[in-house]
Amino acid sequence: MANAPIRLLIAASGTGGHLFPAIALAEKLPDYQIEWLGVPNRLETQLVPKEYPLNTIAVEGFQQGFGLSSIRIFGKLAGSIIEVRRILKQGNFQGVFTTGGYIAGPAVIAARSLGLPVVFHESNALPGKVTRFFGPWCSAVALGFEVAAKYLPRAKNVCVGTPVRGQFLDGAINSPLDLAIPDGVPLIVVFGGSQGAVAVNKLVRESAKAWFDAGAYVVHLTGDRDPEADSLKHPQYIALPFYNNMAALLQRATLAISRSGAGSLTELAVCGTPAILIPYPFAAEDHQSYNADVFTSSGAALTLKQSELTAQILQSNVLNLLQSPQELAKMGENAHAIAVPDSAEKLAQLVREVVET
């Protein structure tokens, strides 16, 4: 009689940065029976493939200070742990994988209280508070950036990189764009991750005329929360809320302007795309600046602080790079050197080693 397939619960919720690496891992474990743990009305309800049944729980993060709201959250956390324990026991799961965030706490506590192994993936250069607290409890902590290990001295750390979506690795990276971009013209791609970046959008629109005059085209992925997304009209400017074929778009790009979330940086690295990075200033513990530092110190990107940034500064930095093709080429090479293209395979192998032994 054949052995029953391994059953794995993946706890990943909230943003593309948490979800895309988890989906990439799941695709590398076709022999596993995988279910998902998420939160109602979050991005996972749209992104997680239907082949992975989605279980949802109510969970919140902790804010500064302690008061009645914290007591309420503690109560909800306790209820979430009980609910995850029920899911794990009823589903006969043999392990848990998580990418952090609010969902990780109840997932790790519930799994470890039942004696189940947990693999935690941390994609950022500065591990989040949840990772720093729960990392030592886990069977292994997989790191996207090697520098993160110094913040997790008591965890069992393994650097595997951060998995990217399959489109970045399966040949789509060289597929043609279905956008009206002439061959040979400089292309600036602006994107703010899965949540967009309204402040960056405004600066780009104010800067773009000089780029058009220099012959560049701009593909601007504005997200879906920018009320002025359609305010700029120009034949060399394409504004879209999102674009599905990001691999081909970044491969074609002469230069990217981006936030520095770990997922976005991983995609830039795999494509070898030089970038100007504008870290999101309100990210938890300013972790996007730590991510950007990895790329800047490697010569793969230029980092500009949003608090000091004006349209004129952004405009001139872009023009300087467009006029320096050798510098752009070197930045692209350095970005590609950071990439771990087989990250999903390495992470899947780690999960197998932890769960099956």
Swiss-Prot record:
PANTHER family reported in the protein's UniProt record: GLYCOSYLTRANSFERASE, UDP-N-ACETYLGLUCOSAMINE--N-ACETYLMURAMYL-(PENTAPEPTIDE) PYROPHOSPHORYL-UNDECAPRENOL N-ACETYLGLUCOSAMINE TRANSFERASE 1
Pathway as given in its UniProt record: Cell wall biogenesis; peptidoglycan biosynthesis
GO cellular component, one term: plasma membrane
Assigned keywords, A-Z: Cell cycle, Cell division, Cell inner membrane, Cell membrane, Cell shape, Cell wall biogenesis/degradation, Glycosyltransferase, Membrane, Peptidoglycan synthesis, Transferase
UniProt entry tagged with the keyword Transferase: yes
Origin: domain of life: Bacteria
Topology in the lipid bilayer: Peripheral membrane protein
Record GO terms (molecular function): UDP-N-acetyl-D-glucosamine:N-acetylmuramoyl-L-alanyl-D-glutamyl-meso-2,6-diaminopimelyl-D-alanyl-D-alanine-diphosphoundecaprenol 4-beta-N-acetylglucosaminlytransferase activity; undecaprenyldiphospho-muramoylpentapeptide beta-N-acetylglucosaminyltransferase activity
The protein's role, per its UniProt record: Cell wall formation. Catalyzes the transfer of a GlcNAc subunit on undecaprenyl-pyrophosphoryl-MurNAc-pentapeptide (lipid intermediate I) to form undecaprenyl-pyrophosphoryl-MurNAc-(pentapeptide)GlcNAc (lipid intermediate II).
Protein name: UDP-N-acetylglucosamine--N-acetylmuramyl-(pentapeptide) pyrophosphoryl-undecaprenol N-acetylglucosamine transferase
Family according to the record: Belongs to the glycosyltransferase 28 family. MurG subfamily.
EC number: 2.4.1.227
UniProt-annotated binding residues for UDP-N-acetyl-alpha-D-glucosamine: T15, G16, G17, N124, R165, S194, Q288
Enzyme class: transferase
GO aspect biological process, one term: carbohydrate metabolic process
Pfam families tied to this protein: Glyco_tran_28_C, Glyco_transf_28
Subcellular location: Cell inner membrane
Catalytic activity: di-trans,octa-cis-undecaprenyl diphospho-N-acetyl-alpha-D-muramoyl-L-alanyl-D-glutamyl-meso-2,6-diaminopimeloyl-D-alanyl-D-alanine + UDP-N-acetyl-alpha-D-glucosamine = di-trans,octa-cis-undecaprenyl diphospho-[N-acetyl-alpha-D-glucosaminyl-(1->4)]-N-acetyl-alpha-D-muramoyl-L-alanyl-D-glutamyl-meso-2,6-diaminopimeloyl-D-alanyl-D-alanine + UDP + H(+)
